[in-house]
Amino acid sequence: MGRLTCYATAAALIACAAITASANAHEVYVSNEKDNTISVIDANKLAVVRTFEVGMRPRGITFSPDQKHFYVCASDSDAVQVFDAATDKWLYNLPSGEDPEQFAVSPDGKLLFIANEDNAVTTVVDLQTRKVVSQIDVGIEPEGMAISPDNKFAVTTSETTNMAHLIDTETFKVVDNIPVDQRPRHAEFTSDSRYLWVSSEIGGTVSIINMETRKVERKITFDIPGLTEDVIQPVGMRLTKDDKTAFIALGPANRVAVVDMETLKVKKYILVGQRVWHLAFTPGEKMLFTTNGVSNDVTAIDVATLRPVKSITVGRYPWGVALKRIQ
């Protein structure tokens, strides 16, 4: 092969690698509850690349389906803040109700469902008009919030009432109240919308609810040698898109449980930072990021090997986490 051909081939390979890296580039946005900031991590470099200020006590964070905006629950500011995803600049606040903690954007990007912990309601905001279209009475201390992929139901979990409240997304009416174990924190639907997973922090379980019968069909429990039951506290969860594997944050147990979604058996416990709270995949599900509130860091986990790759220092009390694609 001639020298010019070699150079051309090398240049093509470099260009291809650059395109691939760009296509797979993501940034991890982490809300720091005590610092009132967002830390942004380069998902390839696994390093914080910038930090910026937001409202008071930021917790829930998510991106719009089109990735043009991101939303932050500034709980002590009683606001959901809207930012430009390209510049990280604050745009405006949405009328969120008191103490917004978690929220979920409808799959069509039109509505935002917000759990208001202090006044026991779910607030629904039209994202185009920026107006409240409904406030729905739910149980005491609502926290978890999810919307089914088919956009038929929203669910709010109430920590003190110990229920998952199913809400019809067209009528904004509660259509069922499903009892679960003590202090339900987080909810996730399977990709086919047939099952709802709810984590119970104090109960130490994850309930799997059949959406057809609206009853708890099975439960997952956890057993970690050397740890007492009271420190094993399921909170944030993520389910793979193929509905084969669940990753469950276990709070002060400092571990993420990896669960086979068919057998509901724990395949592995991954040791991470202290008081692991919420989780987020990269879009291709190759990496999983965990927020560790007490150790003030984020753990990056290789999903293929189920091993932690790096611990990344962020702000104080990291809480929520969301992924942004870089165009």
What are these regions (language model features)?
Residues 4, 12-327:
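Predominantly soluble domains enriched in secretory-pathway, periplasmic, or organellar proteins
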